[in-house]
């Protein structure tokens, strides 16, 4: 698949593991005009569940930002942490659960392979299917705006 950038990397134990999006940078949609949708959601989440917000920020966003990539296992299994969204071409959803709030969270992002960026588009609490479809459409719309700005 073209949208998944797999890279071989040695871990500290010397074994090889597949990493997703190694060497990519992070772009938080519209943070350059002070509309950081994902960062704002995580800031609000920190007030009620700092552990989950910190986990998303440090274990996902910061690892990509530092160029380390994410483990390919996050896309595998019955309940993958990262799932490709069917409606979007290169759209993924990061799935987390806040045990403190007893709510599922979704962080939507796309992969810009040309510019080697992971573009974080939207973050929200999961609700009914209708609301989730709207959240996905919003993420797709934001990614199209991002691509238009890149031209």
Region annotations inferred by a language model:
Residues 104-110:
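Short glycine-rich, acidic/polar surface loops and turns
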Residues 111-120:
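Active-site beta-strand-loop-beta-strand hairpin of nuclease catalytic cores
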